[in-house]
Amino acid sequence: MSHPPRQSSAVYRRRRLAALGLLAALSAVAGIAVGAGDGSRGDTNRSSADSRVAPKPVELPRGGRRIFPDFRVVAFYGAPQSRELGALGIGTPDQAVRRLEAQAKPYAKRTRPVLPALELLADVANRDPGRDGLYRTRQPSSVIRRYLAAARRAKALLVLDIQPGHADFLAETRHLDRWLREPDVGLALDPEWHTPGAIPGTVIGSVRASKVNQVARHVAAIVRENDLPEKLFVVHQFTPNMIAGKAGVVQPPGLAVTMNVDGFGDRPNKVAKYREFTHDGTRFHRGYKLFYEEDTGLMRPRSVLALQPPPDLIVYE
């Protein structure tokens, strides 16, 4: 898929920015201090007898410790502050999960079941610079906790998406460390909204491979130090230069590094763009993004699965 025509892209970004403008008020409450998780990782007050037994390694929500190729991940993307931010924010978290499960069902195969995921905007690029001048608003911890609880009820993953504005990807990731220590929480980087020197939405952002690698190694260390199952690590891309030096992106043990072909348009252009960005074969896991409102003729699941190579991750916005 070619990048959308300039006028369509501008209209889309204006709509997104109108929604992002509503989020400035979040910055006043984004510093809420709460604990991560809901206690599901086990009781720390074990008896001395229990402590002599090696604990069973924690698994993914639907079993096992490896995401790909054991599962195909189908995700909803968005945030609750506005439906313009994506499908995940429409209705309550549980309502979004029910719609996601219905959408994901056609992708499930006997040899490759579906693992649902909620891709929640944890950092939202903002047209308002905010008090720190970084043009991004951090999602309140109470919201992240609510979506994590909904994901766990559905045996799904939570994926925290970073739209950093003028902030640094690694710094924003470190802010999410308490969540990333959970076995069912992954991370996504959204370079379109990394725009140092410009207001988000007025230009298309990008990121260098070296910056992606800093984040990947940091998250991989969390996986290793906490003996976690494989963690989903997504980088969105819809222009060739959105990830500068892409060939140099590392794939540390413990991460399912996935390049998600982003961007809306008609089917021929989307398919062409997918082929362009997946020509390097099996080096990275592959993702494909669909837009309920912006795509011209939403592709059906059987058409998505017919892509070559078939995507490991399918995201709906």
What are the language-model segments listed below?
Residues 76-148:
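N-terminal carbohydrate-binding/catalytic regions of secreted carbohydrate-active enzymes
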Residues 79-81, 121-125, 163-165, 190-194, ...:
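Active-site beta-loop-alpha junctions enriched in small/polar residues
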Residues 182-202, 206, 233-234:
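Active-site groove signature of glycoside hydrolases
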Residues 2-24:
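N-terminal export and membrane-targeting signals
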Residues 29-51:
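C-terminal region of N-terminal signal peptides and the immediate post-cleavage residues
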Residues 168-180, 243-249:
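Distinct, well-ordered alpha-helical segments
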